[in-house]
Design a protein with these regions (language model features):
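Positively charged, solvent-exposed patches that mediate nucleic-acid binding
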Residues: 1-116
Length: 116
């Protein structure tokens, strides 16, 4: 996943949180906002220290980045979103993470094609 698809500045992440438009479950929450000037979507990951040690947090971030990059062709171009990973997600396998995130992407209408 190229770095231009990531939200890096904390002010941009705070702006997404201020919109308060989100969907979530007991494992993840997705906050989103619109960026009409963008030619592609951008995202950020937030994972707290309660999730586990640095190794497990980095593994979760790598997995989620991979899931987003696999489905990057079907995200709406003008969206900014932040994926918040909750501590319960530590017990999930890669396939379970993928399934739950895709359901949340569809619920939050970030994907262009809901049939994917």
């Amino acid at each position: 996943m190229k770095k231009r698809y990531r939200i890096k500045k904390s002010s941009e992440i705070d702006a997404v949180f201020k919109v308060r438009k989100f969907k979530g479950d007991s494992y993840f929450a997705i906050y989103q906002s619109d960026d009409l000037d963008a030619d592609h979507f951008r995202f950020a990951l937030s994972i707290g220290k309660k999730y586990g040690n640095a190794v497990s947090r980095n593994l979760a971030k790598r997995r989620i980045r991979m899931i987003v990059s696999e489905h990057s062709g079907i995200f709406i171009k003008s969206k900014l979103f932040v994926i918040v990973v909750k501590p319960l997600a530590q017990s999930l396998s890669y396939q379970e993470i993928k399934d739950k995130l895709i359901v949340l992407f569809k619920k939050s209408k970030i994907m262009e094609n809901a049939n994917e």
